[in-house]
Amino acid sequence: MTVRRVMGIETEYGIVVPGDPSANPMVASGDVVTTYATSRGIRPARASWDYADEAPLRDARGFDMGRGIAHPSQLTDVEDPTLANVVLTNGARLYVDHAHPEYSSPEVTTPRDAVTWDRAGELVMREAVARLATMPPGINLYKNNTDGKGSSYGTHENYLMSR
């Protein structure tokens, strides 16, 4: 059976700065993104994303929480100038997702292509880590799903389906 739909894979990577347990993971994640982008001549400029339909303070029932009582981490509609975000030449997106670097594959139409471009994301991250290793203490990335301290992250498969 042939699969005929648009799909993609997003992978969030765990991040650690060796020997520095107090390192800011958002800054370290930004270093991963900008190091790779710069090494490839990709300008790490902010892409314009349309968040007009998003309501980060609305729950599943449709009720809105007031901004004044929301925790700052819930105000995700406010742009953070420290976050790095680039679109790669293969159509993938490499960016900081909260406190993790994330590789979002290009949209594809076959499972084989989804796996191919997910593997490309691993190579992107490997190259970024190798380049950062030349500037101690370097950075370690993990393709697992928890850091043992309560933070979790992972991989998301995405499929375009008719309703």
What are these regions (language model features)?
Residues 145-162:
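Histidine-centered divalent-metal-coordination microenvironment in nucleic-acid enzymes
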